[in-house]
């Protein structure tokens, strides 16, 4: 092309880079947001609008963020941004969970001995460590672009939060729902503390299982003293604590002769037990019911001087074992209930570290100080020596573990604080019935977990946490009432929780209870009680944030955790659910579906990712996933996301470049051609669908709609054919301004739909827009109303034109293969429409839309190839190519350019 004509083309221009450079640009954009306080500005702008409150579940303040944190916070961030741009005041108050064992452990790893360090000094170290972790994580969330003010947050260690939590404890106590009792609970020797059900996870382990024969010493009319009762257990270490044997009231039992010994076991299990123990032959001597065995006494299998009874057990079945249950009241919930029913105190000679105490010395001195797991071997050898061991076998089975230390836990009878749920259970379940959930099955799951939940163990034997406010006399008898509790909590509100650990008990007691040598409780509240109080603490701190909140969104591991604790606490506190809607998301896994772990080397550090590839790419990945299921992420998936990002970015760059001379205040056109109206109709359809998907929190639908729109509606259609108009037409021609008007609306549509996702890129787009009266940030704007929906008749016609376009393109492809033409603009196209599509013939600009030289309609279909809605023929246009627009014409001015181009050139 001659330079003179090249220079007359209106080639687009923009400062918006083709290369993203997100790792460098994003921090700069974030600094601008911080400097101009964009989040605070938006909250101010939205004052008076309806409140939308998403309550942020607090991540634990220990260590750097992982990919699961990024997924969770990005999902929340997209919700908040969408709501703020669509008529709501939607604050994002982030929270942190800051008490508990992991922080204590982190401090002790710094060389601090918890037991040798003064309590307040140790607690201050924990606080300092936790606050550093909060600051670190807050900065990392900022790098991911979270729309919040990190100065306005909630942290469970702050004074106001701790006092709010204690007021909740007080309210529960006043409702007579808090009690202290000796009960078997989950105990973690590795963390030396009680655990709640929500802190338990199950893992497969190999354990010894044993069949034990216990000799009858006091029989009855049916059972002689030469008979032996057979029990089976997976915890041999509990045999020293055996207090009873339990039989089922409606279970049938046999007396069986095998190897010249007589054994009692459930009839239905005889064959199975015989096979497991290795009885080659056996004989059924008698049959009897469970109650006929009750009252029989047997010698303890290890300590023959200890005589124990046979009793009825409500929990006994004949589905496994022997149908007779070894009962140790100190190490099992059902066992505890049974021994208490018979007036016997549970025997639990295991200390906080899982070692046998001196209580066992009366029977077996060698066990004192032995770790419970190590006792399995000792017990097995002793049973074998006494000929009480019938069979030992190792089996794999699911066993409870401490969710923090990942080590096994035991059931252990200790004195703990509990919240009794009986009074509130019906209201809790009624509240669950009222919420909506995503996925739908989530409601049933939460309901089941709460329905099955037993009383909540809320005490922990640690230092770093909120103290349980209670007192004891010199005989360790509990001294507590409403007056004492109210006074003590008021005093803590004045002095802070640290005071509880270093000031005398009298400081916290009403005058009438002082000088009585009372002692303070040493236990602290469960961290789930902390985080489960967060909705209440927030509603008390911000009076304009009443319960219930609109939304809770966390991982699907929180049904037994935060979802659960929050529902219990809020119901007891206010009678209400803390949330109207609950959403759970899956876990992040690698591309093969494997859980991410350091050992597999398949983890993805979100901050490292943001600093190399950009937070916007990570956010686009989040939007692309069905988050209700586990989300896969890895190199191939990220590559696909990167390709989608480039399509989106290049499309917006093209639009920006071709709006360089468009001033919407002067050049915006309302009288548009049919194809422009069709493009705007499609824009509105997609935006409406995507907006509905946003409202339904279905971000993968938004992602698919936008990527499909960019690829098909824009790149493959509208943006393709308008290049001729944009580049060739006179700069201020009506037709060019019409097309630019459509581009302007298309850009705003992409801005609105991508603003919650590609937060940095859309800011960059906005700042690159010209001839616009701009505000500080795109994130201060509300979504633009874009209602361009056309009639069904109009849309049907244009949908058919798109089908005709496909028909023409197929014919052009055949013509290219047959060497009739090289390019579409060389083609003369003849179309014979099928009868029901004749209304297309009146449409103008079709040759431009189809990017051909000319297009004509005929009623003579002969010689044309049949396609979907038309018969199409293609011929080569004979003529000369215009040096400016490349169109083929019969004649050119000066043998160089066409009349249209000449008129444009002459006007320059």
From Swiss-Prot:
EC nos: 6.1.1.5
InterPro entries registered for this protein in UniProt: aa-tRNA-synth_I_CS, aa-tRNA-synth_Ia, Anticodon_Ile_BEm, Ile-tRNA-ligase, Ile-tRNA-ligase_type1, Ile-tRNA_ligase, M/V/L/I-tRNA-synth_anticd-bd, Rossmann-like_a/b/a_fold
Principal location listed in the UniProt entry: cytoplasm
Keywords on record: Aminoacyl-tRNA synthetase, ATP-binding, Cytoplasm, Ligase, Metal-binding, Nucleotide-binding, Protein biosynthesis, Zinc
PROSITE patterns: AA_TRNA_LIGASE_I
Binding locations of L-isoleucyl-5'-AMP: 554
Residues that bind Zn(2+): 882, 885, 898, 901
Leading EC class: ligase
Molecular-function GO term, any one: isoleucine-tRNA ligase activity
Highest taxon of source: Bacteria
Intervals of motif 'HIGH' region: 59-69
Localization annotation: Cytoplasm
HAMAP family according to UniProt: Ile_tRNA_synth_type1
NCBIfam families given in the database record: ileS
The family this protein is said to belong to: Belongs to the class-I aminoacyl-tRNA synthetase family. IleS type 1 subfamily.
Record remark on domains: IleRS has two distinct active sites: one for aminoacylation and one for editing. The misactivated valine is translocated from the active site to the editing site, which sterically excludes the correctly activated isoleucine. The single editing site contains two valyl binding pockets, one specific for each substrate (Val-AMP or Val-tRNA(Ile)).
Protein name: Isoleucine--tRNA ligase
Native species: Mesoplasma florum (strain ATCC 33453 / NBRC 100688 / NCTC 11704 / L1) (Acholeplasma florum)
Underlying gene: ileS
């Amino acid at each position: 092309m001659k330079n003179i004509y090249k220079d007359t083309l209106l080639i687009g221009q923009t400062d918006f880079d083709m290369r993203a450079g997100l790792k460098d640009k994003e921090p700069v954009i974030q600094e601008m947001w911080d400097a101009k306080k964009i989040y605070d500005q938006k909250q101010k702008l939205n004052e008076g609008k309806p409140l939308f409150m998403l309550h942020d579940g607090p991540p634990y303040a220990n260590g750097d963020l992982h990919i699961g944190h990024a997924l969770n916070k990005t999902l929340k961030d997209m919700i908040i941004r969408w709501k703020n741009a669509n008529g709501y005041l939607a604050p994002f108050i982030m929270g942190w969970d800051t008490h508990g064992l992991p922080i204590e452990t982190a401090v002790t790893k710094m060389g601090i001995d918890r037991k040798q360090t003064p309590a307040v000094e140790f607690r201050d170290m924990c606080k300092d460590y936790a606050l550093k972790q909060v600051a670190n994580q807050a900065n990392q969330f900022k790098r991911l672009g979270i729309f919040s003010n990190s100065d306005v947050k909630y942290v469970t260690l702050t004074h106001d939060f701790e006092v709010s939590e204690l007021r909740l404890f007080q309210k529960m106590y006043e409702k007579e729902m808090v009690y202290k009792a000796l009960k078997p609970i989950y105990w973690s020797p590795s963390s030396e503390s009680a655990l709640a059900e929500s802190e338990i996870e199950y893992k497969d382990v190999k354990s010894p299982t044993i069949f034990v024969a216990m000799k009858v010493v006091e029989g009855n009319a049916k059972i002689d003293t030469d008979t032996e009762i057979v029990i089976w257990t997976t915890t041999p270490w509990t045999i020293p604590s055996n207090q009873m044997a339990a039989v089922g009231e409606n279970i049938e039992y046999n007396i069986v002769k095998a190897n010249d010994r007589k054994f009692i076991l459930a009839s239905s299990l005889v064959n199975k037990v015989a096979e497991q123990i290795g009885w080659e032959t056996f004989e059924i001597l008698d049959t009897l019911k469970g109650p006929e065995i009750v009252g029989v006494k047997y010698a303890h299998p290890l300590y023959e001087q200890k005589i124990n009874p046979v009793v009825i057990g409500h929990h006994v079945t004949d589905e496994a074992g022997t149908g007779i249950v070894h009962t140790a009241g100190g190490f099992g919930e059902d066992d505890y209930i049974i021994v208490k029913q018979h007036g016997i105190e549970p025997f639990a000679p295991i200390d906080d570290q899982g070692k046998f105490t001196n209580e066992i010395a009366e029977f077996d001195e060698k066990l004192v100080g032995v770790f419970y797991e190590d006792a399995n071997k000792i017990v097995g050898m002793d049973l074998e020596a006494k000929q009480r061991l019938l069979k030992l076998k190792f089996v794999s089975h699911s066993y409870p573990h401490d969710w923090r230390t990942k080590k096994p836990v035991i059931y252990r009878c200790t004195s703990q604080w509990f919240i009794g749920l009986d009074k509130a259970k019906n209201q809790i379940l009624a509240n669950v019935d009222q919420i909506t959930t995503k996925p739908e099955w989530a409601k049933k799951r939460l309901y089941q977990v709460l329905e099955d939940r037993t009383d909540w163990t809320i005490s922990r034997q640690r230092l770093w946490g909120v103290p349980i406010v209670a007192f004891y006399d010199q005989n360790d008898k509990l001294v507590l009432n409403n007056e004492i509790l109210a006074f003590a909590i008021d005093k803590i509100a004045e002095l802070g929780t640290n005071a509880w650990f270093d000031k005398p008990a009298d400081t916290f007691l009403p005058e009438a209870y002082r000088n009585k040598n009372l002692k303070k409780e040493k236990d602290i509240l469960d961290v789930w009680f902390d985080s489960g109080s967060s909705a209440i603490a927030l509603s008390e701190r911000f009076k304009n944030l009443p319960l219930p909140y609109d939304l809770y969104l966390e991982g699907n591991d929180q049904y037994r955790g935060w979802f659960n604790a929050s529902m219990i606490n809020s119901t007891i506190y206010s009678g209400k659910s803390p949330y109207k809607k609950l959403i759970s998301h899956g876990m992040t896994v690698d591309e093969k579906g494997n859980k991410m772990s350091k050992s597999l080397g398949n983890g993805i550090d979100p901050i490292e990712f943001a600093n190399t590839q950009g937070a916007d790419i990570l956010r686009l990945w989040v939007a692309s996933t069905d988050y209700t299921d586990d989300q896969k992420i890895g190199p191939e998936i990220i590559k696909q996301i990167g390709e989608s990002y480039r399509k989106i970015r290049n499309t917006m760059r093209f639009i920006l470049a071709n709006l360089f001379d468009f001033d919407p205040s002067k050049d915006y056109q309302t009288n548009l051609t049919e194809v422009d109206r069709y493009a705007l109709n499609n824009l509105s359809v997609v935006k409406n669908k995507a907006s509905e998907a946003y409202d339904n929190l279905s971000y993968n639908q938004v992602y698919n709609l936008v990527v499909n729109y960019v690829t098909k509606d824009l790149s493959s259609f509208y943006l393709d054919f308008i290049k001729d108009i944009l580049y060739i037409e006179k700069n201020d021609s009506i037709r060019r301004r019409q097309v630019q008007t459509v581009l302007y609306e298309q850009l705003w549509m992409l801005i609105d739909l991508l603003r919650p996702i590609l937060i940095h890129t859309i800011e960059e787009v906005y700042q690159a827009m010209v001839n616009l009266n701009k505000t500080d940030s795109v994130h201060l704007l509300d979504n633009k109303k874009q209602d361009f929906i056309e009639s069904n008749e109009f849309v049907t016609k244009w949908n058919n034109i798109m089908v005709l376009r496909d028909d023409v393109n197929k014919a052009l492809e055949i013509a290219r293969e047959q060497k009739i033409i090289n390019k579409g603009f060389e083609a003369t196209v003849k179309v014979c429409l099928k009868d029901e599509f004749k209304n297309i013939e009146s449409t103008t600009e079709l040759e431009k839309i189809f990017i051909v030289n000319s297009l004509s309609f005929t009623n003579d279909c002969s010689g044309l190839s049949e396609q979907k809605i038309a018969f199409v023929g293609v011929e080569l246009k004979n003529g000369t190519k215009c040096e400016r627009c490349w169109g083929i014409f019969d004649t050119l001015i000066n043998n160089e350019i066409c009349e249209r181009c000449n008129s444009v050139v002459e006007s320059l």
